[in-house]
């Protein structure tokens, strides 16, 4: 399989975050292509635009995308998601839920798919959008897959450090330091604008993420 792994952050983020993410992927002999962009005033929308850019510019047949504060805990994640998306009709990744709990979707923190699937779904934009379902970055892609009877594989939550968020369909809370399938770790809210998260929590999340990376590197 011709697979590309990507992530995104803004240039004002603590550079150690991208550095440590890269170190973890190096540990597993995997290359992650990190898009580092100048920050804009609309980070949520910018995230979607950069994902669009990654898809347009990528040369690979299969794409796996991580948030900058998301890392694998074991190499097994790679074998697992590659097997899942190799049929060219499966969108696979972390389970997320709309703000009002009306709809589950694949979360932008970690997901993978084939270019064939993306094209067959009409090359949906990854832009964040507002709707009755409080649409998030990858929700439109998820919805198109469902409409066309494609396959969705959700990576389920197996642990979390706190319970900031909630998925009603599974009656499960999760938050900063969430682990999926015992294979993927996502810190959450490490690069949000400070208007969304106080500076102390912002720094705490960064430090916790770096500590987790160090644990993985020593394992």
Predicted regions and their residues:
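Active-site acidic short loop of glycosyltransferases
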Residues: 58-61, 87
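A structural signal for short, well-ordered beta-strand segments and their strand-loop junctions
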Residues: 64-65, 90-94, 151-157
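Short, solvent-exposed loop/turn segments at secondary-structure junctions
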Residues: 10-13, 39-41, 69-71, 97-99, ...
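C-terminal catalytic/acceptor-binding lobe
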Residues: 133-219
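N-terminal anchoring/stem segment of glycosyltransferases
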Residues: 1-49, 53-59
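Short beta-strand-to-loop acidic/aromatic patch adjacent to the donor-nucleotide binding site
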Residues: 61-71
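Conserved catalytic core of nucleotide-sugar-dependent glycosyltransferases
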Residues: 71-144
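Residue-level recognition of beta-strand->loop/alpha-helix junctions
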Residues: 34-38, 95, 156
């Amino acid at each position: 399989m011709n697979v590309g792994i990507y992530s995104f952050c803004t240039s004002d983020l603590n550079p150690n975050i991208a550095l440590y993410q890269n170190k973890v992927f190096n540990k597993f002999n995997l290359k992650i292509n990190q898009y580092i962009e100048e920050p804009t005033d609309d980070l949520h929308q910018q995230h979607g635009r950069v994902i669009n850019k990654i898809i347009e510019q990528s040369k690979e047949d299969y794409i796996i995308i991580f948030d900058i504060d998301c890392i694998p805990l074991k190499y097994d994640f790679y074998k697992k998601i590659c097997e899942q998306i190799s049929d060219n009709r499966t969108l696979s990744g972390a389970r997320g839920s709309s703000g009002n709990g009306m709809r589950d979707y694949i979360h932008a923190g970690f997901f993978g798919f084939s270019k064939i699937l993306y094209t067959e779904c009409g090359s949906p934009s990854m832009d964040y959008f507002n709707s009755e379902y409080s649409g998030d970055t990858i929700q439109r892609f998820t919805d198109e897959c469902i409409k066309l009877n494609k396959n969705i594989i959700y990576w389920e939550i197996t642990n979390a450090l706190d319970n900031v968020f909630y998925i009603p369909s599974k009656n499960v809370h999760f938050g900063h330091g969430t682990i999926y399938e015992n294979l993927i770790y996502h810190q959450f809210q490490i690069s949000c604008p400070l208007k969304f998260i106080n500076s102390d929590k912002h720094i705490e999340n960064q430090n916790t993420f770096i500590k987790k990376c160090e644990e993985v590197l020593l394992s």
